[in-house]
Amino acid sequence: MKGMFRTGLILFAAAAAACAPRERTLVLLSTNDMHAKIQNFPRLAAAVENCRDTAQLVVLVDAGDRWTGNAYVDMAATPGMPMIALMNRLGYDVATLGNHEFDHGQAFLGRMIDSMAFEVVCANVTSDTCTFPQLPPYVVLDKDGIRIGFVGVVTNYEGPGHPAGNASSFEGLEFPDPQAMAMKYAAELRPKIDLLVLVSHMGDDRDVELLGKETRFDVVIGGHTHVTVS
């Protein structure tokens, strides 16, 4: 009986260890407003690969405005494609839209999204046109058992009612309030995931304003206003 009791303790201890949560390190790396600065990509790629060599789990995210700003990229046979090719090769996971994604029209952007090997999410753009795909508002990634939700939003403040840019680029599209849509999907996702990330192209002032109203986001990855956050 004494030997059986010891065996029972060992089995119980093993079962308890198997059920205990594992401690893992997750690193979120982000870019925003790269504006086709292709000359900086080697340094970016080196930093990302170095992090992947040292961290257990790495997720790479972009918060919009990937092209418009460099003649080589903007005058390529397919404007913007050199940046997308490099982003695909580096292995981005998730991105949202910036206002400059619309610079060459909806049909062009739709084709570019098809060429992106990463998830593109935006919760506050709806389309009734056949030239622009209806994007998912969010995506959930599972990284070694950690469920991470990414909600994307883009500014609609400069239009007003749509992002900054030529109004003809936005015909047939609607851009509901990005903060309201972020809050809607935060409420929907929060019970289902471990980590909730907002990928925002609203600007730092609007991001801070949102965080005063919405506490369910664990991380905000922002862009649009080109502000360095320390």
Residue ranges with predicted function:
Residues 1-8:
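Bacterial N-terminal signal peptides that target proteins for export
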Residues 10-20:
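Hydrophobic h-region of N-terminal signal peptides that target proteins for export
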Residues 19-230:
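Acidic, metal/ion-coordinating pockets
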